[in-house]
Amino acid sequence: ATLAPTVLIFPPSPAELATGTATIVCVANKYFPDGTVTWQVDGKPLTTGIETSKTPQNSDDCTYNLSSTLTLKSDEYNSHDEYTCQVAQGSGSPVVQSFSRKNC
């Protein structure tokens, strides 16, 4: 059975932005089978500055968890608006979470 993840995305804090760095974190919890994370900025795929770590399967329910971190310079972060994290499992629809900088 496929279990879709709960996906959350966290924008960088103003305190961090003030240091010149922006870290955006995407967390996906309790999903099966294993999946992949992709990031988009203003609708375009992004492949650099990403670090993803997965936890091993949970022995109780065989699900996975992951967290993916996108790190940018503050200037670059401020020059874009929409940040999107997608978690895809096989052929199903990916679970998508995004935020718009204008709304934060």
Curated annotation (Swiss-Prot):
Protein origin, superkingdom: Eukaryota
A Pfam cross-reference name: C1-set
Hydrolase listed as a keyword: no
Transmembrane segments: none
Additional detail: The cDNA from which this sequence was derived contains a terminator codon within the V-region coding region. The origin of this codon and of the differences between this and other sequenced b5 C regions are unclear. The cDNA clone was made using mRNA from trypanosome-infected b5-homozygous rabbits.
InterPro entries assigned: Ig-like_dom, Ig-like_dom_sf, Ig-like_fold, Ig_C1-set, Immune_Resp_Modulators
Listed PROSITE patterns: IG_LIKE (PS50835)
Entry keyword set: Disulfide bond, Immunoglobulin domain
Keyword Lyase tagged: no
Protein name (record): Ig kappa chain b5 variant C region
Disulfide bonds, paired cysteine numbers: C26-C85
Taxonomic lineage from the root: Eukaryota, Metazoa, Chordata, Craniata, Vertebrata
Domain Ig-like: 5-100
